[in-house]
Amino acid sequence: MQFSKMHGLGNDFMVVDAVTQNVFFSPELIRRLADRHLGVGFDQLLVVEPPYDPELDFHYRIFNTDGSEVAQCGNGARCFARFVRLKGLTNKRDIRVSTANGRMVLTVTDDDLVRVNMGEPNFEPSAVPFRANKVEKTYIMRAAEQTILCGVVSMGNPHCVIQVDDVDTAAVETLGPVLESHERFPERANIGFMQVVKREHIRLRVYERGAGETQACGSGACAAVAVGIQQGLLAEEVRVELPGGRLDIAWKGPGHPLYMTGPAVHVYDGFIHL
């Protein structure tokens, strides 16, 4: 099986063309491939499939290292767009894809960045899903014998965003896994730790559902900005500084889609016998 290794701000992916190759990924195979010592190693596996709708270009599937399938990955979406152009699967700059959650448009810019229409953030608790009676800008949760104030949103996947004074000293490794599997998140959640530097600039670390802390989480950056705007903390255009680098997020508010712009890097191509 041929594959490519790619990354978006250090969030790394194994990308496989299932348009021209006949491949099947069981959870066991994904876990084996994800092993950084015995396999290929990655944060997530991205699979390019033929579209289910003639109006679309591709179907986009995402798997975590534990073999579970997820509906959204912003950094992966940028790598997906670069991959299909690099491999000659399309020459379009505007690429329309379906995911387990819906549809997305990926745009490759003139300077080889990728702009992703992430859709409109959804704050309805049932959409996240999150156990709450109504939409609130801030929820109060109990976790690890602490009272946590957080914002909750779906970007096609569940996100919880906590404001911290300094991301360098935030309890990502201890509080992250506790909140990820908190009973109020029946499908678990991605946990963002957000430091507001100013209205146009935040620093962010994300403990990802099924993957742990990563160098960057695209949908997590989108979620943090959406929550920050909802809470009146941020402007419509925000620079997000992650451990792996920078993303630019723009959202005009309710009724509008949110846009993420950032890099996608091809590292190498490989072949593995399954």
Swiss-Prot record:
GO terms for cellular component: cytosol. The record marks H159, E208 as: Could be important to modulate the pK values of the two catalytic cysteine residues. InterPro entries: DAP_epimerase_AS, DAP_epimerase_DapF. It is found in: Cytoplasm. Its EC number is 5.1.1.7. Substrate binds at N11, Q44, N64, G74, N75, N157, N190, E208, R209, G218, S219. Gene3D superfamilies: Diaminopimelate Epimerase, Chain A, domain 1. It catalyses: (2S,6S)-2,6-diaminopimelate = meso-2,6-diaminopimelate. One of its GO terms (biological process) is lysine biosynthetic process via diaminopimelate. It holds the Pfam family DAP_epimerase. GO terms for molecular function: diaminopimelate epimerase activity. Pathway: Amino-acid biosynthesis; L-lysine biosynthesis via DAP pathway; DL-2,6-diaminopimelate from LL-2,6-diaminopimelate: step 1/1. The record marks Y268 as: Important for dimerization. The active site is at C73 (proton donor), C217 (proton acceptor). Keywords: Amino-acid biosynthesis, Cytoplasm, Isomerase, Lysine biosynthesis. It is an enzyme of class 5 (isomerase). Belongs to the diaminopimelate epimerase family. Homodimer. NCBIfam families: DapF. Catalyzes the stereoinversion of LL-2,6-diaminopimelate (L,L-DAP) to meso-diaminopimelate (meso-DAP), a precursor of L-lysine and an essential component of the bacterial peptidoglycan. This is Diaminopimelate epimerase. It comes from Escherichia coli O81 (strain ED1a).
